[in-house]
């Protein structure tokens, strides 16, 4: 064996021995009461940092949405400005006069010998069949929004919460329209959805309107991410919905 190979082998063995010594010393450190207290404090600080990172992530998402909205507004204002400038430069020198027509004719203008035409009443239309009403989630009021703790709503706005309620109502209406639809008129896709809806019902949801995350993905553009679940916490706080769990599913019941 060459001397260089022997030196490399010795170096490798010494490195392994050093790693073992460090591991043993760290394990022994973890058993000391004073160091346990320090490790517990570090664990608590890591939890706090994780919460701050979650809030920071929500703040970044909010700022991105605000930035996109401002860009759209700026583009819209530029278009409006161009239209106004075009109108300003192309105003005609003479505008047509508006002619006023009298809707009622005075009695003195009528010819007494001319027979008066009596209009026949239109046939009464049959009222449409009553459609089964679907319960929707009421929007959040300003007072309710102000009553939500600041740590819960973070940077979320009043309009953002009500926009989510609008999307949830869209999912509820789409789901229960299928459930109220005659089975004969269903295609294969609708029939599969119908059977899924029936399978998801339990004795606790009987007679109540509810959706699951799959309905959110099926009927809306919402994403079931951290922000969505923060919004659900706010809706639970405002008593707009409750949860029924079972069979690996969380059912969001409209209250």
UniProtKB/Swiss-Prot annotation:
InterPro entries linked: SKA1, SKA1_MBD_sf
Single GO molecular function: microtubule binding
Sites of Phosphoserine modification: 242
Coiled-coil features, chain-numbered ranges: 49-91
GO biological process, one term: metaphase chromosome alignment
GO cellular component: centriolar satellite; centrosome; ciliary basal body; cilium; cytosol; intercellular bridge; kinetochore; microtubule cytoskeleton
Phosphothreonine: residues carrying this PTM: 157
Positions bearing N-acetylalanine: 2
Residue window of motif SXLP motif: 93-96
Pfam families, per database record: SKA1
Stated consequence of mutating residue 155 to A: Decreases microtubule binding
Stretches for region Binds microtubules and protein phosphatase PP1 subunit PPP1CA: 132-255
Keywords, ordered alphabetically: Acetylation, Cell cycle, Cell division, Centromere, Chromosome, Coiled coil, Cytoplasm, Cytoskeleton, Kinetochore, Microtubule, Mitosis, Phosphoprotein
Record PTM: Phosphorylated by AURKB at Thr-157 and Ser-242 which negatively regulates the association of the SKA complex with kinetochores to allow correction of aberrant kinetochore-microtubule interactions and promote mitotic sister chromatid biorientation.
Localization (cell): Cytoplasm, Cytoskeleton, Spindle; Chromosome, Centromere, Kinetochore; Cytoplasm, Cytoskeleton, Microtubule organizing center, Centrosome
Biased composition (Basic and acidic residues): 114-131
Protein family: Belongs to the SKA1 family.
Subunit structure: Component of the SKA complex, composed of SKA1, SKA2 and SKA3. The SKA complex is a homodimer organized around a central W-shaped coiled-coil structure, formed by the interacting domains of SKA1, SKA2, and SKA3, each end of the 'W' is extended further by the C-terminal microtubule-binding domains of SKA1 and SKA3; the complex forms extended structures on microtubules. Interacts (via SXLP motif) with MAPRE1 (via C-terminus); the interaction is direct and stabilizes the kinetochore-microtubule attachment of the SKA1 complex.
Protein name listed in UniProt: SKA complex subunit 1
The gene coding this protein: SKA1
């Amino acid at each position: 064996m060459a001397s260089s190979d022997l030196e490399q082998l010795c170096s490798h063995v010494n490195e392994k021995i050093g790693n073992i010594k460090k591991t043993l010393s760290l394990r022994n450190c973890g058993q000391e009461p004073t160091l346990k207290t320090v490790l517990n404090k570090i664990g608590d600080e890591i939890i706090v940092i994780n919460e701050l990172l979650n809030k920071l992530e929500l703040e970044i998402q909010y700022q991105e949405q605000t930035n996109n909205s401002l860009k759209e507004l700026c583009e819209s204002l530029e278009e409006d400005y161009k239209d106004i400038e075009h109108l300003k430069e192309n105003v005609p020198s003479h505008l047509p006069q508006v002619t006023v027509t009298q809707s009622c004719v005075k009695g003195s203008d009528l010819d007494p010998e001319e027979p008066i035409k009596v209009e026949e009443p239109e046939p009464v239309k049959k009222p449409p069949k009553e459609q089964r009403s679907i319960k929707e989630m009421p929007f959040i009021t300003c007072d309710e929004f102000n009553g939500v703790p600041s740590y819960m709503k973070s940077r979320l706005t009043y309009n953002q919460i009500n926009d989510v309620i609008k999307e949830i109502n869209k999912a509820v209406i789409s789901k229960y329209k299928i459930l109220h639809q005659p089975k004969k008129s269903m295609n294969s896709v609708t029939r599969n959805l119908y059977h899924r809806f029936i399978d998801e019902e339990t004795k606790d949801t009987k007679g109540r309107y509810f959706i699951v995350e799959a309905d959110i993905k099926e009927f809306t553009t919402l994403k079931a991410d951290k922000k969505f679940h923060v919004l659900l916490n706010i809706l639970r706080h405002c008593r707009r919905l409750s949860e029924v769990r079972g069979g690996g599913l969380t059912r969001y019941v409209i209250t």
